């Protein structure tokens, strides 16, 4: 790794500032999904075992910066963490002027987004945060694409900055899939809009042998192949881009299996009847909400040949059971594959949970935007600053 990891750093009797991703759902003062909290436990436990004091920082939701708002308070998260780790977790509401913490203790700081200057990573705020600790640990890959005070600025001014266990695992898994993949490699890029994934598709074309498109993205490709998509979600102004991607794929020998059959409905509704049709038979008042059985078979067959699979996005409206078959078939094909598989993005994780394949995916990324930017080949500011610190 081109940056320091937690295990490279002496933590004994050090105040260790850890940027975690505790942006979790809270309802009636209770955390309803603890996945992101659980993901940070190895880093927290390691620091405690090494004799360090833990100061945790995170954002929660999107409050108005510099204004306290109780609905975005991290106090319920501190309670949930205490239950999971079976240790007291102190909560610091006002923490910028100093945090009282001893070796072996954990303090959860209030929402970083209540601080003025967080998003712009002002020098004033960054220096203030850096002064609270001896070591900074970045362990929130989900926010690594943002140069903010608690992810980037603090690393600039603190004596030692390194990557936590979760962040290190994320980078290793993604680099294994993208920089040194075992071939053949397949990528699945789904979701509603091609515009948000265009640079991902272009970046992956040079790396994969199979590129599977799904959702609204696939509809734009179906249109690019000259078929009518009726009332379906697609992007007319990006049909030309889709045509270019298909031509480029052909020249590079990349297989893009555009759906040959689909499940359509007359309305976007959970109870709408799913009708299976060839793509050539879709009419004006129908909308494509899932791929059909033939397309499922083609995808499953292609994935059997892959040694590396990268998955971001569903291939249909899997939240509606009538239109979940395509994403279910895709999920099961990945689960049954011998390939090294990496999955990321909110909808993808929801599909993994719905179809019960969590243990069959090699690595599940907790990130959304940062995962996408990594797939685009972009540099992530919070990772770059760790690399710079390692050189100094």
Curated annotation (Swiss-Prot):
Chain positions recorded as ATP binding sites: 197, 319, 345-348
Matches recorded under SUPFAM superfamilies: Phosphoglycerate kinase
Keywords associated with the record: ATP-binding, Cytoplasm, Glycolysis, Kinase, Nucleotide-binding, Transferase
Residues where substrate binds: 21-23, 36, 59-62, 113, 146
Assembly description: Monomer.
PANTHER family per UniProt: PHOSPHOGLYCERATE KINASE, PHOSPHOGLYCERATE KINASE 1, CHLOROPLASTIC-RELATED
Similarity remark: Belongs to the phosphoglycerate kinase family.
Listed name of the protein: Phosphoglycerate kinase
């Amino acid at each position: 790794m081109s940056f320091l990891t937690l295990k490279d750093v002496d933590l004994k009797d050090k105040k260790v500032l850890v940027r975690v991703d505790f942006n979790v759902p809270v309802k009636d003062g209770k955390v309803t999904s603890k996945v992101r909290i659980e993901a940070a436990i190895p880093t927290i436990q390691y620091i405690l075992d090494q004799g360090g004091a833990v100061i945790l920082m995170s954002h929660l939701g999107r409050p108005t910066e510099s204004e306290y708002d109780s609905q975005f308070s991290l106090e319920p998260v501190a309670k949930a963490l205490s239950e999971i780790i079976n240790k007291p977790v102190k909560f610091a509401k006002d923490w910028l002027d100093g945090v009282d913490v001893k070796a072996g203790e954990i303090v959860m700081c209030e929402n970083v987004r209540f601080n003025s200057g967080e998003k712009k990573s002002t020098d004033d705020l960054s220096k203030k945060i850096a002064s609270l600790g001896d070591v900074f640990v970045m362990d929130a890959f989900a926010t690594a694409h943002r140069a903010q005070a608690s992810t980037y600025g603090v690393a600039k001014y603190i004596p030692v900055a390194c990557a936590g266990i979760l962040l290190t695992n994320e980078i290793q898994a993604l680099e294994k899939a993208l920089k040194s993949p075992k071939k053949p490699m397949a990528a699945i890029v789904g979701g509603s809009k091609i515009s948000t994934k265009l640079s991902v598709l272009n970046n992956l074309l040079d790396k994969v042998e199979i590129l599977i498109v799904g959702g609204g993205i696939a509809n734009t490709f179906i249109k690019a192949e000259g078929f009518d998509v009726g009332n379906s979600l697609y992007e007319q102004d990006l049909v030309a881009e889709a045509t270019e991607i298909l031509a480029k794929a052909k020249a590079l020998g990349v297989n893009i299996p555009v759906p040959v059959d689909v499940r359509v409905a007359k309305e976007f509704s959970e109870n709408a009847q799913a009708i299976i049709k060839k793509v050539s038979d879709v009419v004006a008042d129908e909308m494509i909400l899932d791929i059909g059985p033939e397309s499922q078979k083609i995808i499953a067959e292609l994935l059997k040949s892959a040694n590396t699979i990268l998955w971001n996005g569903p291939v249909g409206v899997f939240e509606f059971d009538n239109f979940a078959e395509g994403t279910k078939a895709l999920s099961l094909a990945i689960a049954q594959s011998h390939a090294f598989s990496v999955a990321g993005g909110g909808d993808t994780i929801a599909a993994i949970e719905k179809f019960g394949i969590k243990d069959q995916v090699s690595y599940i990324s907790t990130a959304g935007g940062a995962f996408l930017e990594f797939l685009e080949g972009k540099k992530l500011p919070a990772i770059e600053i760790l690399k710079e610190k390692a050189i100094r």
